[in-house]
Amino acid sequence: MIKSELVQRIAEHNPHLYQRDVENIVNAILDEIVAALARGDRVELRGFGAFSVKHRPARAGRNPRTGAHVPVDQKSVPFFKTGKEMRERLNRDNPEGAAADDADD
């Protein structure tokens, strides 16, 4: 599901809201999550999961084409850890662990 599909779904489930308002709300939430991570904060949504930033140290990499060693700078990467309720629901709804079918979208 992409962001526009998420906005459309939320708007369909909330007919009292205009789709453009739902889009503004979704964008505001995502912007605030990104801003918090950029400040170094952790964002926890109980039952859903937690967003945080992991710092990867500089390391020596290798160009796969030439085999030459190249330095890879340190970097910060986003990290998401699922919440307990989400894990339980995913395992309850899908006990075999197989990918969900897109037919129900």
Swiss-Prot record:
Keywords: DNA recombination, DNA-binding, Transcription, Transcription regulation, Translation regulation. It comes from the Bacteria. CDD domains: IHF_B. One of its GO terms (biological process) is regulation of DNA-templated transcription. One of its GO terms (molecular function) is structural constituent of chromatin. Pfam families: Bac_DNA_binding. PROSITE patterns: HISTONE_LIKE (PS00045). One of its GO terms (cellular component) is cytosol. Heterodimer of an alpha and a beta chain. Belongs to the bacterial histone-like protein family. HAMAP family: IHF_beta. This protein is one of the two subunits of integration host factor, a specific DNA-binding protein that functions in genetic recombination as well as in transcriptional and translational control. This is Integration host factor subunit beta.
